[in-house]
């Protein structure tokens, strides 16, 4: 696998304390605020007119929760990310035509949200491990492009 045993345990220890529903909504919401061009994939989600509207939007929260539950699933199959995300890759890439760059952006936003939530607990080694994970997941999701 691409993570050492040590990194896996850092990732899993922190993840066991994550409120997946809450963090998912926050990460997706921040993606749409910070990188507004990503909003074009979410035009059916209703009011995205301001940061407050986005962060309070129930459809954004619901999809964020879905996204992070998939990510959680990926962590359980960390050595087979391509297999785990094959169907989602197909959906996002072939059917929805999402630019794979957006998966990287969301991964970076997720790292910011975790840092924000966990403060000092989100040490440099923990961040390093998470950066590897989000890059691995983004790659797996972009897989259908290669």
Swiss-Prot record:
The modification S-nitrosocysteine is found at residue 93. The modification N6-acetyllysine is found at residues 59, 82, 144. The modification Phosphoserine is found at residue 44. InterPro entries: Globin, Globin-like_sf, Globin/Proto, Hemoglobin_b, Hemoglobin_oxygen_transport. Heme b binds at residues 63, 92. Residues 2-146 form the Globin domain. One of its GO terms (biological process) is hydrogen peroxide catabolic process. Gene3D superfamilies: Globins. The keyword Cytoplasm does not apply. One of its GO terms (cellular component) is blood microparticle. SUPFAM superfamilies: Globin-like. Red blood cells. The keyword Repeat does not apply. Keywords: Acetylation, Heme, Iron, Metal-binding, Oxygen transport, Phosphoprotein, S-nitrosylation, Transport. One of its GO terms (molecular function) is metal ion binding. PANTHER family: HEMOGLOBIN FAMILY MEMBER (PTHR11442), HEMOGLOBIN SUBUNIT BETA (PTHR11442:SF42). Involved in oxygen transport from the lung to the various peripheral tissues. Belongs to the globin family. Heterotetramer of two alpha chains and two beta chains. This is Hemoglobin subunit beta. It comes from Crocuta crocuta (Spotted hyena).
């Amino acid at each position: 696998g691409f993570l050492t045993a040590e990194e896996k345990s850092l990732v899993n220890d922190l993840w066991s304390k994550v409120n997946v529903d809450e963090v998912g909504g926050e990460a997706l919401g921040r993606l749409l605020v910070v990188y507004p061009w990503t909003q074009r994939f979410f035009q059916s989600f209703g009011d995205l007119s301001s940061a407050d509207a986005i962060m309070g939007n129930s459809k954004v929260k619901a999809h964020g929760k879905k996204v992070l539950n998939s990510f959680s699933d990926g962590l359980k199959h960390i050595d087979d990310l391509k297999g785990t995300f094959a169907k989602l890759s197909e959906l996002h890439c072939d059917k929805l035509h999402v630019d794979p760059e957006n998966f990287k952006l969301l991964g970076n936003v997720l790292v910011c949200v975790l840092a924000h939530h966990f403060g000092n607990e989100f040490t440099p080694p923990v961040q390093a491990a998470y950066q590897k994970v989000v890059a691995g997941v983004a790659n797996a999701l972009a897989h259908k492009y290669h």
